[in-house]
UniProtKB/Swiss-Prot annotation:
Domain Integrase catalytic: 54-215
GO biological process, one term: DNA integration
Family to which this protein belongs: Belongs to the transposase IS3/IS150/IS904 family.
Record-linked NCBIfam families: transpos_IS3
Gene Ontology terms for molecular function: DNA binding
Source organism of this protein record: Haemophilus influenzae (strain ATCC 51907 / DSM 11121 / KW20 / Rd)
Record's protein name: Uncharacterized transposase-like protein HI_1721
Keywords: DNA recombination, DNA-binding, Transposable element, Transposition
InterPro entries: Integrase_cat-core, RNaseH-like_sf, RNaseH_sf, Transpos_IS3, Transposase_IS3/IS150/IS904
The keyword Ribonucleoprotein belongs to this UniProt entry's keyword annotation: no
């Protein structure tokens, strides 16, 4: 909010907080996250990132996770990949079941963006990421697998922060009647997040604008 206001007026984050308090505005609470861990069902990769969520160029470090949404028709699952260079969501898939086919569709999108790069792809120890099929996709495309330690959300906080923003800004406090309505909202938000939502860590630019400027 602070950076959005700075587009038209000079203001700092403390004043924004005071104005929100005066107006009675509060941040929305987070709900319990989807847990994909089902024990060790396959190979557990080393933690290559060790909470270093910084990158010096696109396609150097990626992170992924799955989160759950609900509407009147049932549950919907989002599986995205985030580039840690500019926080851009470079690939994602929405499905009504968090299955291997969802991960495969997401990876197909991500691989199309590699352009010869060999990134690290970091995740938790969810069963999807332990599957030999997933690990084969990474290996065949020169992607290094990295996994968080079990039961510590701080080791994938970069993706958790995106989920928190998404749900706070377009999901919490709203009722969705159909899958179609919820899917449309998520598609539109991810486009907005990538192309328009400015971030302090990106010098007040959106992820796509930051990447574009860095490559010029």
């Amino acid at each position: 909010m602070t950076f959005k206001l700075r587009e038209t007026i000079k203001i700092n984050h403390k004043k924004v907080q005071r104005i929100m308090q005066w107006l009675g505005l509060k941040g929305k609470c987070k709900t319990q996250k989807y847990r994909s861990y089902q024990g060790e069902v396959g190979h557990i990769a080393d933690n290559l990132l060790q909470r270093d969520f910084t990158a010096t160029q696109p396609n150097e470090k990626w992170t992924t996770d799955i989160t759950e949404f609900k509407c009147a028709e049932g549950k919907l699952y989002l599986s995205p990949i985030k580039d840690l260079f500019n926080n851009e969501i470079i690939a994602y898939d929405l499905a009504r079941s968090p299955n291997f086919e969802q991960i495969t569709r997401m990876m197909k999108q991500a691989v199309a963006r590699l352009e010869g790069a060999k990134p690290i792809l970091h995740s938790d120890q969810g069963w999807q990421y332990q599957m030999i099929g997933y690990q084969n996709i990474l290996r065949e495309n020169g992607i290094q697998q990295s996994m968080s330690r079990k039961g510590n959300c701080l080791y994938n906080s970069a993706m958790e922060s995106f989920f928190g923003r998404l749900k706070t800004e377009c999901y919490y406090g709203k009722r969705f009647e159909t899958f179609e309505q919820l899917e449309k909202t998520i598609h539109e938000y991810i486009h907005y997040y990538n192309h328009e939502r400015i971030q302090g860590k990106l010098k007040g630019l959106s992820p796509v604008n930051y990447r574009t400027q860095s490559l010029n």
